[in-house]
């Protein structure tokens, strides 16, 4: 029998943490954020991961955001919206902004530039607009 190890604070900080998943409209995939933390740097980072509900390996969808999170599928399933603090076109977000990305990957596109940042957004049923 394997020797039991105590759970320490250092071990807890090393664990990656999954954020709330969002299920694709057809139910075949889910997307969630996966966060990691560095006690040494006192910094956190997160990326979006795509998971098949039919089995198979999860794959990263985003790589370069500071805090990619709160993913939501569009009603048609052709886009995933999320909030993030990123650097794009030589400009770094001061506050979390709204981005969209296709589920098959590519570069995420900033939807707007909101001085106070974006939280708590929702797709409208037409899949063309997002309210926040």
Please report, for each region that a protein language model flagged, where it lies by residue.
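Beta-strand-rich domains and repeat architectures in extracellular enzymes and scaffolds
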Residues: 10-46
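Short loop/turn segments that connect beta-strands within beta-propeller blades
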Residues: 52-56, 102-106
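A flexible loop/linker signature enriched in serine peptidases of the S9 family
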Residues: 34-47, 62-68, 83-99, 107, ...
């Amino acid at each position: 029998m394997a020797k039991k190890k105590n759970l320490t604070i250092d071990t807890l900080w090393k664990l990656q943490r999954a954020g709330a998943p969002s299920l694709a409209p057809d139910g075949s995939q889910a997307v969630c954020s996966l966060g990691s933390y560095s006690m040494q740097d006192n910094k956190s980072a997160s990326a979006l991961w795509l998971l098949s509900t039919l089995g198979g390996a999860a794959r990263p969808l985003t790589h370069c955001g500071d805090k990619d999170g709160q993913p939501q599928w569009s009603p048609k399933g052709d886009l995933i919206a999320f909030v993030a603090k990123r650097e794009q076109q030589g400009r770094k977000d001061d506050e979390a902004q709204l981005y969209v990305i296709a589920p098959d990957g590519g570069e995420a596109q900033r939807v707007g530039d909101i001085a106070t940042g974006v939280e708590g957004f929702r797709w409208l049923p037409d899949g063309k607009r997002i309210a926040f």
